């Protein structure tokens, strides 16, 4: 049976992207789901938290708590997960995060789809530079970095923020700001199909759901 590794920057659960990926790849693929924060104690989780001056990433723990994590502190944890997957015979893995991570070490024999690279190229494919692009991120402090990246790519950017683990009302209100955009990118793997549908309806705009894009590409590359 083919194996597909799914690397969460939080703790491995079946609540987030796993059902979507399963629907896309079918039942003939073994999903090897592991989280960078798997097995960490509350003390270790506190040590991995983002500092005030850092650009954090938001993820969910197995118990449903939402946490803000330091990207540099995640890198060795992600590398450990990748090494374990390669040792277990996984040949294709997806890093289920749209953030950038410096210092990733990809084991020999393992192909890694990085969420950031995949989603940025998907945006370019569906929305030409110069167009008005909506960018939805979990936290207000993420707007400057994510929005700035797409501005540098040539887009007129409209940013909004709504925690994917927060209320649907918050998301719906935020989505109104995207009316008139050529497309919206959900710039976090925590956003699911229900989030995409809310944004599409409220903003009357086509929406790129990051985890679904990753799943479809992975399905084409499985070997």
Predicted regions located by residue number:
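Extended, histidine- and acidic-residue-enriched regions that form the cofactor-binding/catalytic faces
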Residues: 5-9, 14-15, 175-214, 220
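Short, surface-exposed amphipathic charged segments that create phosphate/polyanion-binding patches used
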Residues: 45-52, 126-134, 174-176, 221-223
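Short, flexible loop segments at boundaries between secondary-structure elements
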Residues: 39, 125, 129, 207-223
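N-terminal glycine-rich phosphate/adenylate-binding segment common to multiple enzyme folds
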Residues: 69-116, 184-196
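Conserved mixed alpha/beta catalytic, RNA-binding, or beta-rich assembly cores of soluble enzyme
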Residues: 92-101, 105-142, 148-152, 156-172
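N-terminal glycine-rich anion-binding loop in soluble enzyme alpha/beta folds
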Residues: 1-69, 135-166
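Short amphipathic alpha-helical segments
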Residues: 18-19, 105-108, 147-148, 196-200
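A short, acidic, amphipathic alpha-helical segment used as a generic capping/interface helix at domain edges
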Residues: 80-81, 167-180
């Amino acid at each position: 049976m083919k194996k597909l590794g799914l690397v969460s920057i939080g703790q491995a659960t079946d609540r987030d992207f796993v059902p979507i990926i399963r629907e896309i790849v079918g039942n003939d693929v073994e999903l090897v789901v592991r989280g960078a924060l798997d097995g960490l104690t509350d003390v270790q989780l506190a040590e991995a938290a983002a500092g005030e001056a850092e650009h954090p990433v938001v993820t969910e723990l197995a118990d449903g708590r939402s946490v803000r994590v330091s990207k540099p502190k995640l890198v060795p944890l992600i590398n450990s997960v990748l090494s374990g997957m390669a040792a277990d015979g996984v040949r294709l893995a997806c890093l289920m995060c749209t953030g950038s991570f410096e210092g990733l070490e990809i084991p020999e024999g393992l192909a890694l789809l990085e969420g950031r690279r995949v989603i940025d190229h998907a945006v370019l494919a569906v929305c030409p530079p110069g167009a008005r692009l909506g960018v939805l991120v979990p936290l207000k402090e993420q707007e400057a970095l994510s929005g700035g990246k797409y501005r540098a790519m040539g887009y007129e950017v409209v940013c909004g923020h709504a925690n994917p683990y927060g209320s649907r009302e918050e998301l719906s209100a935020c989505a109104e700001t995207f009316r008139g955009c050529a497309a919206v990118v959900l710039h976090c793997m925590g956003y699911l199909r229900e989030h995409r549908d809310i944004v599409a309806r409220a903003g009357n705009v086509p929406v790129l759901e990051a985890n679904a894009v990753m799943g479809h590409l992975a399905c084409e590359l499985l070997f």
